[in-house]
Amino acid sequence: MSTKPKPRYRRILLKMSGEALMGNQAFGLDPKVVNRIADEVRQLHEAGVQVAIVIGGGNLFRGAQLAALGMERVTGDHMGMLATLMNSLAMQDALEQIGVPVRTVSALRVDEICEPYIRRRAIRHLEKGNVVISAAGTGNPFFTTDSAASLRAIELEVDAMFKATKVDGIYTKDPNRYDDAVKYHDLSYQKALTDNLGVMDATSIVMCRDNHMPLIVFDMTKAGEIIRAVFGEDVGTIVHA
């Protein structure tokens, strides 16, 4: 009698860039991509995995880029936080459409739209079987959504953080530009930091390293890859302390 495989991780945080929701578009959201990702989150939810999500806003707005063109950085970052909220609401709607209970929480107060991020309440939502989408980054300028994801992963006591990218892991150099790029199966946060491998910004890496938070970097453009990763298959690159 065959036994049904069980997920390796009980509670996870999925970090997606805003660009992951664009598909082949140059801007905005591709509903087909959003719906596919939502369905994969549904499968994880039905397998008993507690899922927290952090989504960037780069498909709609990048505060750092406008700051380079003269806009005050704080203003640009606040606008970027609102872009993450827009993406979070899109994912919330896609999940609700397929019957997944979900709560969007925000580091900025927008009470008419969603509840504020309160750590204990967010953990309780996860324990009750709700997917939790954390919007607006850390609520502070000068911090990336990678930093926000690392912070939330640590605060919510997840078993591992999963970073969705457009390549199937971390390489010695950009595999889209260099044919001799070699993929890492696993590596330490210190090596990622020392070799400047572009996994995440330094703040994010140090937070994960110091709090022994495992990170799995995988290719979100491959259908079902997040499910395989959470179930412990040999997917992507594992980064560890």
Curated annotation (Swiss-Prot):
EC numbers for this chain: 2.7.4.22
The protein's enzyme class: transferase
Species annotation: Dichelobacter nodosus (strain VCS1703A)
Residue sites binding UMP per the record: 57, 77, 138-145
Subcellular location: Cytoplasm
UniProt pathway annotation: Pyrimidine metabolism; CTP biosynthesis via de novo pathway; UDP from UMP (UMPK route): step 1/1
Family of the protein in this entry: Belongs to the UMP kinase family.
Keyword vocabulary terms for this entry: ATP-binding, Cytoplasm, Kinase, Nucleotide-binding, Pyrimidine biosynthesis, Transferase
Classification via Pfam families: AA_kinase (PF00696)
Annotated binding of ATP, by residue: 15-18, 58, 62, 165, 171, 174
UniProt-listed GO biological process terms: 'de novo' CTP biosynthetic process; UDP biosynthetic process
Subunit note: Homohexamer.
InterPro entries named among the record's database cross-references: AceGlu_kinase-like_sf, Asp/Glu/Uridylate_kinase, Uridylate_kinase, Uridylate_kinase_bac
GO annotation, cellular component aspect: cytosol
Protein name: Uridylate kinase
Regulation: Inhibited by UTP.
Catalytic activity, as annotated: UMP + ATP = UDP + ADP
Main location: cytoplasm
Role according to the record: Catalyzes the reversible phosphorylation of UMP to UDP.
GO-annotated molecular function: ATP binding; UMP kinase activity
